[in-house]
């Protein structure tokens, strides 16, 4: 996996953007980058950090699993992190350029389909915007003051 990490170029952009090939091992590596960023930025307990990282991992794992299914080459995924110190919120967005897969469109499998439920349980707000040209999953977490 080749991940690239960089601070955003403009103040209105994310504080951190990390991009990697959309594969399962990358989900863990990108989640670790988010954890390191959170530890430097926000003053919350380790349980809250773990919840945020787990939600991020789940969004990344879903992307690695579904975004480029059926395509010859594996695409990329990015995670964007933003800390709004005034609002005391953290917003994480996982972005891909694959094809949106409606979770209700496939056959029911009792061993799968818990990702969105888990993300909803862990974050304060979840938005999913999927199109034929990519998907953007954003998770917002409240009560995250600056260090």
Range-by-range predicted roles:
Residues 32, 36, 121-124:
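Generic recognition of well-ordered alpha-helical segments
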Residues 50-70:
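Histidine-centered phosphotransfer motif of kinases
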Residues 20-26, 30:
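A short beta-loop-alpha structural element at the N-terminal edge
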Residues 35-57:
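Conserved short strand/loop->alpha-helix "switch" segment adjacent to the catalytic nucleotide/phosphoryl-transfer site
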Residues 1-21, 64-147:
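Conserved beta-strand-loop-beta-strand hairpin that lines the nucleotide-binding pocket
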Residues 25, 47-50, 75:
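Conserved catalytic/ATP-binding subdomain
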């Amino acid at each position: 996996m080749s991940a690239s990490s960089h601070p955003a170029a403009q103040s209105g952009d994310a504080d951190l953007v990390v991009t990697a090939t959309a594969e399962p091992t990358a989900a863990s590596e990108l989640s670790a980058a988010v954890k390191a960023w959170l530890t430097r930025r926000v003053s919350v307990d380790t349980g809250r950090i773990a919840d945020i990282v787990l939600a991020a991992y789940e969004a990344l794992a879903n992307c690695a699993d579904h975004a480029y299914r059926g395509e010859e080459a594996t695409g990329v995924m990015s995670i964007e992190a933003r800390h709004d110190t005034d609002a005391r919120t953290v917003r994480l967005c996982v972005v891909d350029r694959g094809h949106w897969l409606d979770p209700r469109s496939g056959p029911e499998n009792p061993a799968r389909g818990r990702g969105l439920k888990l993300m909803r349980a862990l974050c304060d707000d979840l938005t999913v915007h999927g199109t034929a040209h990519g998907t953007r999953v954003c998770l917002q977490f409240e009560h995250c003051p600056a260090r």
